[in-house]
Amino acid sequence: MATRAQAREAVVSLLYAYDMGNTEIRKFAIELLEEKRIKNRQQEFALELFDGTIAHLGEIDEEIKKHLKEWDFSRIGDMERAILRLGTFEIVYSGVDRAVIINEAVELSKTFGNDNSPRFVNGVLDALRPDLKKG
């Protein structure tokens, strides 16, 4: 059985594909998740994260932009952007502890990003105000 960390990793891949112009990726999401052996509750979790992130993408991007110090949003690496979007969605819209979300995002950035990605992702997500919760 897949873990939530593996589900998040798959969601980052889906968000990356979406960002690269594959806006129809949702049609294939279940098949892709099953290929990665993400099923049942973890699959539901992954789809909720993906769908929620896409549904709130404009708001999420604006929130990220507020916390970029001396960075332009368009200069963020594609994988880092996907990780930040997922992390921001979870911090703002889920009941999961911020520290868990940030830790998961940092671990994802170690896998998908460059040497500077973990520190960058940590800094941006840590700057999000904890009172940002939205319904």
Swiss-Prot record:
Molecular function GO terms recorded: RNA binding
Domain of life: Bacteria
Any one of the GO BP annotations: transcription antitermination
Entry keyword set: RNA-binding, Transcription, Transcription antitermination, Transcription regulation
InterPro entries reported in the protein's UniProt record: NusB-like_sf (IPR035926), NusB_fam (IPR011605), NusB_RsmB_TIM44 (IPR006027)
The UniProt record lists the keyword Transcription: yes
Function (record text): Involved in transcription antitermination. Required for transcription of ribosomal RNA (rRNA) genes. Binds specifically to the boxA antiterminator sequence of the ribosomal RNA (rrn) operons.
Similarity-based family: Belongs to the NusB family.
Protein name: Transcription antitermination protein NusB
Protein species of origin: Wolinella succinogenes (strain ATCC 29543 / DSM 1740 / CCUG 13145 / JCM 31913 / LMG 7466 / NCTC 11488 / FDC 602W)
Lineage: Bacteria, Pseudomonadati, Campylobacterota, Epsilonproteobacteria, Campylobacterales
Gene designation: nusB
